[in-house]
Regions:
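Structural signature of the two symmetry-related core transmembrane helices
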Residues: 126-141, 149, 192, 340, ...
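Helix-breaking motifs and short loop linkers at transmembrane-helix boundaries and internal kinks
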Residues: 123, 144-149, 161, 178, ...
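Central mid-sequence intracellular linker of multi-pass
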Residues: 14-63, 70, 207-280
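Hydrophobic alpha-helical transmembrane and interfacial-helix anchor sites in secondary transporters
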Residues: 16, 118, 204, 348-351
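Glycine-rich segments within core transmembrane alpha-helices of 12-TM secondary carriers
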Residues: 2-6, 105-111, 162-167, 171, ...
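Intracellular juxtamembrane helix-capping segments at the cytosolic ends
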Residues: 84-87, 164-177, 319, 396-413
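Flexible cytoplasmic loops linking transmembrane helices in multi-pass membrane transporters
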Residues: 42-95, 257-326
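C-terminal transmembrane bundle
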Residues: 3, 7, 155, 159, ...
Length: 434
């Protein structure tokens, strides 16, 4: 759902050819006649998109003046199918198009850390539910928006709510999965959308769906997400970390019942763990120096996480939004290559650990980036496409491994806030990349 919103402009943000609109009193003129008669020719030989002659029709031998226009005609079957024509984001209003990309990214980056703190204090589930239904209502409002300010505001709500929902669900998945399978499930959670959503949207964009149909796809997926969030229980790991042991026991016993584990045995095991937790709390109070050392280590790891998220997100968003390797063959090659790369990364995470895997993936991505710069400087267009495709695969994989490393870096009591803070760094990178 996050990538559906991030890449929505592939469907509803198409650039549209435009020209100054024919006045009502000259509406009998064909578009070709109007352009030949009333639109200036630019230096490149094309008709001007933003100016027209005043007066529109020659009424004497005097020279006519080219003046800017404030209404436009568009080369699109339905004006409402692209935000460019829907809100007239052309000529002196063209900057509003870029603004509609930057404001949601920046706003989401600012809001996410605050909501992350809330999730660490009141729980993953309440924040996840609130944000899931917020993005559903905001998506519906965005679909029916008729003015640019409403569109921009609802898009900001969508980005903020969607990002926080994803972070909460990812954190929940990380916390309820055992150590043996954690790397598998968390990486798959990131790999599936990274691999399949960009090609899927490319295929959908080929058929040029109408505004309502394109948004209906997002509304349906968001509705399914909200329904799933409603059925999810609170993270027992967070409940234990915050010492809400009564609720933690209820959740653990429910999970035991759902997974066919003997409930009485699960209750006995939980009581034993509860006793160990009390002894650990006593030891922690007796040795405050150890807590200080752990805090210093956490700060160093957090700094590396923030830098990694900034770099990887900036590169990934830039590659996805300005992709040059488009077409069915390229998309199929991307899917196959990404599956192999993610599978290799998963194997490395199991055998070498997340940190070494992330370092290796970033080295490969950096190598491809340098190689692409070299072949581009030499004008090797065909080779550039292949190198670009490889870079996109490694950056996508690196983004996934970075998020897994982020979840491992922060302890449970501040994990959601830590991931959201790294998302802020990534959001700043996204703005740079966009």
């Amino acid at each position: 759902v996050v990538l559906f919103h991030y890449l929505a402009y592939k469907l509803v943000g198409k650039q549209v050819d435009h020209w100054c609109m024919t006045p009502d009193d000259l509406s009998f003129l064909s578009i070709a006649t109007w352009k030949n008669t009333s639109i200036p020719i630019e230096a490149d030989g094309n008709y001007s998109r933003c100016t027209m002659y005043d007066p529109p029709l020659p009424i004497s031998q005097e020279n006519r003046t080219a003046v800017p226009c404030h209404q436009w005609g568009y080369d699109i079957a339905n004006k409402a199918d692209s935000i460019v024509s829907r809100f007239d984001l052309v000529c002196d209003r063209e900057y509003l198009y870029d603004l509609s990309e930057i404001v949601p990214l920046f706003g989401s980056g600012l809001v996410s850390p605050a909501l992350g703190l809330v999730a660490d204090h009141v729980g993953r589930r309440p924040v996840m539910l609130a944000c899931a239904f917020t993005q559903l209502f905001a998506t519906v409002a965005n679909t029916f928006s008729e003015t640019y300010p409403l569109f921009l505001f609802t898009r900001f709500l969508i980005f903020a709510a969607t990002d926080v929902t994803f972070i909460a669900t990812f954190t929940l998945l990380h916390e309820v999965t055992g150590n043996a399978r954690r790397s598998t499930f968390t990486l798959i959670d990131i790999a599936v959308p990274h691999i399949f959503v960009p090609p899927l949207l490319h295929v959908i964009s080929i058929v040029k769906p109408r505004w309502m149909l394109a948004n209906a796809l997002t509304i349906v997926t968001t509705g399914l997400l909200a329904s799933w969030c409603w059925l999810v229980e609170e993270s027992p790991t967070w409940l234990v970390a915050t010492r809400d042991l009564r609720r933690a026991e209820v959740t653990v016993l429910l999970a035991a019942r759902e997974n066919g584990v003997d409930v009485a045995k699960a209750r006995t095991t939980f009581k034993a763990i509860e006793g160990q937790l009390r002894r650990l709390d006593t030891c922690a109070m007796a040795d405050p120096m150890e807590a200080i050392i752990e805090t210093m280590k956490l700060r160093r790891r957090a700094a590396s996480v923030l830098l990694a998220r900034f770099v990887m997100d900036a590169t990934y968003i830039s590659l996805i939004m300005n992709d040059v390797t488009t077409g069915i063959r390229w998309e199929a090659a991307y899917v196959l290559s990404s599956v192999v790369c993610y599978a290799s990364a998963l194997g490395c995470m199991r055998s070498c650990g997340i940190r070494k895997t992330l370092s290796g993936v970033m080295v490969m991505a950096s190598t491809f980036a340098v190689f692409e710069a070299m072949v581009m400087s030499r004008g090797e267009k065909v080779l550039t496409l292949y190198v670009h495709a490889g870079l996109k695969v490694f950056v996508s994989t690196g983004s996934g491994v970075t998020l897994c490393y982020t979840a491992e870096t922060f302890p449970t009591v501040v994990r959601n806030a830590g991931i959201c803070l790294s998302h802020f760094a990534g959001g700043m990178g996204c703005i740079l990349g966009a």
